[in-house]
């Protein structure tokens, strides 16, 4: 309702494999020490699901793209500090509400360092989804009819190979 006809919607958010190393390390540590696990990293939407949502809510010319970034830290505790500053602490309803035990946290650090370190630093993956779409308006350009193009796409692609 707030987007005018022919208005451009732009959004970005963390998605899919963001913090996959942290998630893996927390799960392994908690399973080892507690015999089970409580989600410690919020789940992130899949790009395909976001693209489908853009179509379902009738955006014209929807585009969904993803940027992948690897960020390196001296220690997993530095990553946790940055996440807290970003406001990305866990807000899951199903999460165990008791405090994270220090032995679990320390084991998570060990697992993270053992599995995801390179040149003395740990890696954290961040995937950012970018979404754009136009609110429908009758003045928008319409796609051409199938087969109406003047250039064969296969031939056009061969020029760049």
Predicted regions and their residues:
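A generic alpha-to-beta junction signature in SAM-dependent methyltransferases
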Residues: 2-3
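Conserved catalytic/acceptor-binding region of the Class I
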Residues: 6-75, 86-98
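C-terminal lobe and adjacent flexible extensions of AdoMet/dcAdoMet transferase-like proteins
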Residues: 52, 57-60, 74-161
